Design a protein with these regions (language model features):
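Single conserved hydrophobic/aromatic residue that forms the stacking wall/gate
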Residues: 1-13
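Gly/Ser/Thr-enriched, mixed-charge loops and adjacent short helices
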Residues: 43-166
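Active-site phosphate-binding/coordination module
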Residues: 11-72, 187
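Gly/Ser/Thr-rich loops at beta-strand to alpha-helix junctions
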Residues: 38-39, 114-118, 178-179
C-alpha cells in the first residue's frame, strides 16, 4: 500500500470525515474507506490532499498512476513507516478551545446510527458543556437499529421520540461517516436543510451587525 511507496502511514481504525479534514498535523493526504450513508454491502474511498478533497481530474490521475505502477524498486529503496495513532482527544481539545462553554444548560440527543459519530460526538458535546442522551453510539457495520442516512426522515423516528421524552433542546443524527446531519427540534420536528441554512445565515448576519 502507501508504505510500499515510501510514504509514512498513520493508521486509525475508525474516524469520522470532518475530524480527518480538520486535524492539525503535517499530514500530506488521507484515504478513508467509507460508503457514507449507502447500504452496508457497499464501500468506497474518500481521498484528500493537503486537507482538501480530490477533484475529478485528480481522481483520474490517481487511477492512471495506480494502473501504470510497477514493482521495480532499487536495492536501497526505503519503505515508509506504518504507525497507529488516536486523534480523538486532539480533535476534541481543538474544537472545545474554539467554542468555549457553548453547551451550558443545553440538553441534546445524539443518534450516531451505530456508525463513526458515536466515537466522537457524545464526548465532544459533553466537553462543550452539554447534557447528552446517546442513541446507538456503538459502531456496528450491520446498522442494526436503522440505516445511517439522516436525509431520510424515516430513519429519525427514534431520535424524534427521544428528544420529546427526555425534554431535550434538540437532537442531532449523523450519517455513516459523520459529514452530514439531521436535526430535530425540541418538539420532535425534523428541520430540513433549507431551515438549517436559514438558522445559520441568521446567526452570521447577527454577528455582522453587532
Amino acid at each position: 500500500g502507501y508504505s510500499s511507496a515510501a510514504s509514512d502511514v498513520y493508521k486509525r481504525q475508525f474516524i469520522n470525515y470532518p475530524k480527518e479534514i480538520t486535524f492539525d498535523n503535517k499530514i500530506s493526504g488521507a484515504l478513508i474507506i467509507t460508503a457514507s450513508h449507502n447500504p452496508k454491502q457497499y464501500n468506497g474511498l474518500k481521498m484528500t490532499l493537503n486537507k482538501a478533497s480530490l477533484d475529478e481530474a485528480q481522481i483520474k490521475e490517481v487511477k492512471e498512476l495506480t494502473l501504470n505502477q510497477t514493482n521495480n524498486k532499487s536495492s536501497n529503496y526505503r519503505f515508509g513507516l506504518c504507525r497507529k495513532f488516536d486523534i480523538v482527544s486532539t480533535y476534541i481539545e481543538k474544537i472545545s478551545q474554539s467554542f468555549t462553554n457553548i453547551g451550558k444548560n443545553i440538553k441534546i440527543v445524539v443518534d450516531s446510527a451505530n456508525a463513526t459519530g458515536g466515537l466522537v460526538a457524545p464526548k465532544l458535546y459533553r466537553e462543550l458543556g452539554c447534557e447528552v442522551v446517546e442513541l446507538y453510539s456503538e459502531p456496528d457495520g450491520n446498522f442494526p437499529n436503522h440505516h445511517p442516512n439522516p436525509s431520510d426522515e424515516s430513519t429519525l423516528d427514534d431520535i424524534k421520540k427521544a428528544v420529546v421524552q427526555n425534554n431535550a433542546d434538540f437532537g442531532i443524527a449523523f450519517d455513516g461517516d459523520s459529514d452530514r446531519i439531521g436535526v430535530i427540534d425540541s418538539k420532535g420536528n425534523y428541520l430540513t436543510g433549507d431551515k438549517l441554512l436559514l438558522i445559520y445565515a441568521l446567526d452570521i448576519v447577527e454577528d455582522l451587525v453587532k
